[in-house]
């Protein structure tokens, strides 16, 4: 049975999106070369969809610049959208060695890249370290050019409060683009929230994530929430904290006084400062922060407090930590798709693709 047909029986995506995804993947993989696409009638037979849905599929692909439709002749692959043969792409990721989330994303990119005739060259952590310390961008670009790298998946350094870091992230992305290397941002932008850069960006809806974290704790009986993050003023923190505030305001809960705490989770003085607010619910930037903070908190205080993290790392499952699971596989697949589109001379405005994170409730918020 056709994979898209199977997906329609099990997926919540609209049927036209599932069929469009299937056709798009084949176009980018070169299966249609520069030839004619299936007609509306052929799509109806192949996927068991209505005529209106088939028309919407072709209209969607046309709006993306992948196909052109000729009156009386049908739909054809846009010559500018054909994926380049055996193009090379690479990664430039600040946190590759410290978060399993990015490892999962890169694995997904590698799997999907092959379907788009893209060859992935893994970027070394050392490369980002050199660039983040004002290493020569010219040298990095020269290495990319020598390796025939046409595109880079870029996760910027996560410290937007530091002006030097913010400017360096922007300089890296803009220099690569100026030198003819396509950039797709993953997880975070190169400008402070709520601003958006003019690069394609794939990640989760961080405002929604903070909202879901807070709403879950409120549903579990919490009324005094605070947000706990590390010392760096990162793009994702500001977005998620906004989401938490939205949830508090929606539920008529107090938002006065300090609600956002940044610090070292292993520092007793920081933990005490947070707990002096007498919170009954803690929202953490990610699970690692929750594990470190609660380890210190449990030594200092006998009272219990409910909490939730984000990322759903392997330790969280064993420790019973409620979390939000980011769809790493889909983020990687979408990043690869956007890269293939851009390398195929796609000229649509910059895209921001945001996924929802899945709530995984466990003992830390549910009790027991």
Model feature map: region roles:
Residues 26, 198-199, 271-368:
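Flexible loop/turn connectors
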